[in-house]
Amino acid sequence: MSSLSQAASSVEKRTNARYWIVVMLFIVTSFNYGDRATLSIAGSEMAKDIGLDPVGMGYVFSAFSWAYVIGQIPGGWLLDRFGSKRVYFWSIFIWSMFTLLQGFVDIFSGFGIIVALFTLRFLVGLAEAPSFPGNSRIVAAWFPAQERGTAVSIFNSAQYFATVIFAPIMGWLTHEVGWSHVFFFMGGLGIVISFIWLKVIHEPNQHPGVNKKELEYIAAGGALINMDQQNTKVKVPFSVKWGQIKQLLGSRMMIGVYIGQYCINALTYFFITWFPVYLVQARGMSILKAGFVASVPAVCGFIGGVLGGIISDWLMRRTGSLNIARKTPIVMGMLLSMVMVFCNYVNVEWMIIGFMALAFFGKGIGALGWAVMADTAPKEISGLSGGLFNMFGNISGIVTPIAIGYIVGTTGSFNGALIYVGVHALIAVLSYLVLVGDIKRIELKPVAGQ
């Protein structure tokens, strides 16, 4: 029996538990972006009900990002302190609860509705803060470098998949039964997903479906398989954490990555806030039609997002260079996304949809910022590093909706808004080509008190 057992062991196939992990990240991120997009789909009807102008709408759109930015560093600290599984569960559960409660804001009247809506959107943003740093930590723990780009592109492409799936559903709900049901539907589904998360997600060393060969494979490729076991029981003084943060802020590479992510997110936030409104107000579509039309560029963004990761990992295997593997899709994708500006010069509906589809295909290919983070984050503060990255990136979520609101409110047109977003794509390209330099994992220097 012993010899048979040894023989069986020697031919044991490597498990692929990490694939189910990234599937779960994809599902959760889809709900994450679905919840963010609820207001953009229901927004036109809500604005009519409560008398909200474009500038006011811009501020309400930005409420999520104010909190999301504020919550990034605390969220990253919580992830490093208590681990991804527990913190992420509470994040999903709480943001879903606040999403559901937005369906009840019409119990208030007048300005009270606006205050309630802004407050609940703010709380959703605060609760979602650990989500993407959590995604990045989990990918860094589960995936070797040669698979990391694809893993990141899969969960990152969920933002487009969310629009493909949920925009038509939310548009139909708004049209047929009223905007409040959009929030009931998304909030309820999210609460269910939070409990599925607890059953599916485990650390690599504790996953019941992983074998030794898979652990050895991912560890050999640079996966940080002991990340949470090392961090959850260690208390680090604030002075040390601050010293580590200053090292990140002093890195030219990281400054370039932060600026690039800010600019890439300008495209993201245009898409999940103003794009459906653009289709309704600037192009005269019904809410129902806009919900379906918005899914076309989203499909292209999804395809581009997955393709960007595959291309990046293929380049990594062929060249062994993180610079070539990560920068090439980012630069080419952002250049392609600038075609959205051409929408200002055409009035044919299919051409507008086509240019937007190309733009979001390019944006999908170039959305590899989280792969760069998984490649560069110091192992001691991977959650905090991801939180800092996401904080800078999502300042764009505050600025972009408000800036577009002012542009549209002042000019009465979306033409300037599309130019504004296109210029950000160009700045992202320059940031990666000029500022970032060599992409490599940061090794922290000892800090006094450590």
Curated annotation (Swiss-Prot):
Coiled coil: none annotated. Keywords: Cell inner membrane, Cell membrane, Membrane, Transmembrane, Transmembrane helix, Transport. Induction: Induced in the presence of D-galactarate, D-glucarate or D-glycerate. One of its GO terms (biological process) is D-glucarate metabolic process. The keyword Transferase does not apply. GO terms for cellular component: plasma membrane. Residues 42-58, 106-109, 175-176, 276-290, 351, 409-415 are periplasmic. It catalyses: galactarate(in) + H(+)(in) = galactarate(out) + H(+)(out); D-glucarate(in) + H(+)(in) = D-glucarate(out) + H(+)(out); (R)-glycerate(in) + H(+)(in) = (R)-glycerate(out) + H(+)(out). One of its GO terms (molecular function) is transmembrane transporter activity. InterPro entries: MFS (IPR011701), MFS_dom (IPR020846), MFS_Na/Anion_cotransporter (IPR050382), MFS_trans_sf (IPR036259), Sugar_P_transporter (IPR000849). CDD domains: MFS_ExuT_GudP_like (cd17319). The chain crosses the membrane at residues 21-41, 59-79, 86-105, 110-132, 154-174, 177-197, 255-275, 291-311, 330-350, 352-372, 388-408, 416-436. Residues 1-20, 80-85, 133-153, 198-254, 312-329, 373-387, 437-450 are cytoplasmic. It is a multi-pass membrane protein. It is found in: Cell inner membrane. Its main location: membrane. Belongs to the major facilitator superfamily. Phthalate permease family. Probably involved in the uptake of galactarate and/or D-glucarate. May also transport D-glycerate. This is Probable galactarate/D-glucarate transporter GudP. It comes from Escherichia coli (strain K12).
